[in-house]
Every structure is written in C-alpha cells, then in structure tokens.
A protein has these predicted regions:
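Conserved N-terminal segment of class I S-adenosyl-L-methionine
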Residues: 1-88, 92, 103-105, 163, ...
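Conserved S-adenosyl-L-methionine
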Residues: 156-167
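A short His-aromatic
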Residues: 93-97
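A short hydrophobic/small-residue beta-strand
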Residues: 49, 118-119
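A short glycine-rich, Lys/Arg-flanked "PGG" loop and its adjoining helix->strand segment in the class I
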Residues: 102-117
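C-terminal helical/coil "lid" or tail adjacent to the Rossmann-like core of SAM-dependent
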Residues: 172-219
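Short, glycine-/aromatic-enriched active-site segment of Class I SAM-dependent methyltransferases
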Residues: 120-140, 144-149
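A structural helix-start
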Residues: 98-102, 122
Length: 249
C-alpha cells in the first residue's frame, strides 16, 4: 500500500495540511525514508534535512529521488546513530517495523528541538490485521489511545490524529486482501522490512499500473476525504499522529 501512488499522493496532501495548520518546520529528519518521496516533497519546498534508512536499496532510491537537492543529506544510518537535533522528525510506515518502539520514541524526543514536531504514520486498529502486515514485516497495529500514551511517556504530547485511509483506500484494501491469495510470507521481519521499499502488496497486473497513472486525477477524492473523514482514526487502517516536544522553559 505504501507504494500505491494515489494513497501516497493523499499522504503528501495531508503533510502539506499539517505544515499549514500546525506550523511544522524544518530542518527535518526522516527515519526510514524508503524511496525518498517525503524528503523529495519537502526538498521541493526548500526544506533542508536528513533522510536515513538501513536498507541499501532504499538509500540508493532516495539518493536518486533527491538528486539536485543539495539541502538534503541521504545516509545509510540507524536512528540510534543520528547526532544533532531537528525541528521535525518524520516516520512514515516505520514505527510498526521497530520491535522496541517505546525506545525509538524516546530517541526521537532526544533528537527534537524544544517545540519541535514528530509526524508519524502507522497502521491502525488491530482488527485490521491482514496478510499484508506480515508481508511488510509489521510487529503490530496501533490504536489512538495506545499511541497517545506511548508518545506521552516519551515526553511528546500528541496534538492530532488523522485517518488517511477511510473510506476509499480502506475499502480497496479490504477487498484486495480478501480476493487475492497471500503470497509466500516472510519469516524474517528485518528482511521483510528491507524488501518493503520495493514490494507492493497491491500488485494487480494492469490494474495497478492504470491506478498509478490516474493518481493526478484523485485530487477531488483527497479534498472530500480530508474534509469528511480525517477525524475518524478508529475507522480506517492507517492514521497520522502529530506530537510536539514542549518548548523550553
């Protein structure tokens, strides 16, 4: 799903609204940058930052996506190895791949400037667990209350939770995972996580390519979904969480 162009476009649409409504600023750190779509989107706005991943393939993809954007550094690096602080930390479809997610949130809090934001996208609602969760190497799905408590424990009070899948993308995933027999599922979560950069569970020959080509036509759907359904994170299968480190003093 992360490589499905219409959904990816809507996630970037929501990112722009977070920036506008909550004053999210760079420089940024993107953890688990994958193909570099988010970092490239921010770089095109003139943001500076760092994009990291532990997959060689992901770093190579991201470096190509960010070619010509000298303000963004791409590195093969783990979160624990990052030094310095940032105004914004972004983790999209990453936290669910980390066994010690509480430890990761504490590290993120250390990498944030006072008053800085963390923007997280995670699979939501445990009852939505399907075979594609295993394909991508997920450890878990999240609830609003559970992630809110985890963020608070890390010193990152939550500001907002927005669903970005209900009803259209949620219904598409429900139908797809019922109709398609699951492929051979990996037993190694780390290998599955690395492969998730290029693996697309939503792979229907012909249909997938056609849907990707229609991505620019989805803007009316994005506007309607944002206006009507973003405040229903209990209904879809993924949501955003925005939190902020308290200002100094």
């Amino acid at each position: 799903m992360a490589n499905f162009a219409p959904l990816k476009g809507y996630m970037l649409f929501c990112l722009d609204r977070f920036i506008e409504r909550y004053g999210v600023q760079g420089p940024f750190l993107e953890v688990g940058c994958g193909r570099g779509d988010v970092a490239a989107h921010l770089a095109a706005k003139g943001w500076r930052g760092t994009a990291i991943d532990f997959s060689d393939d992901a770093v190579a993809h991201a470096a190509r996506a960010l070619k010509g954007h000298s303000g963004v550094t791409v590195a093969r690096q783990a979160l624990a190895e990052v030094t310095g602080t940032f105004r914004c930390v972004i983790l999209w479809d990453v936290l669910e791949h980390i066994e010690d997610d509480d430890g990761a949130l504490r590290t993120i809090a250390q990498r944030l400037d006072a008053g800085g934001h963390v923007l997280i996208a995670v699979p939501s609602n445990p009852h939505e667990w399907r075979w594609d969760d295993e394909l991508y190497g997920h450890w878990r799905r999240y609830t609003v209350d559970g992630l809110r408590a985890q963020l608070a424990a890390a010193g990152l009070p939550a500001l907002a939770f927005w669903d970005f899948t209900f009803p259209v993308f949620w219904a598409m995933r429900r139908a797809y995972t019922r109709m398609k027999s699951p492929p051979a599922l990996p037993v190694d979560r780390e290998a599955a996580t690395k492969a998730s950069t290029s693996v697309n569970a939503w792979d229907v020959p012909g249909l997938s390519r056609w849907l990707d080509r229609t991505a620019p036509l989805w803007l009316p759907v994005h506007h309607a979904t944002f206006r009507l359904f973003r405040h229903a994170p209990h209904r879809g299968h993924e949501f955003f969480a925005l939190a902020q480190k308290p200002a100094a003093g």
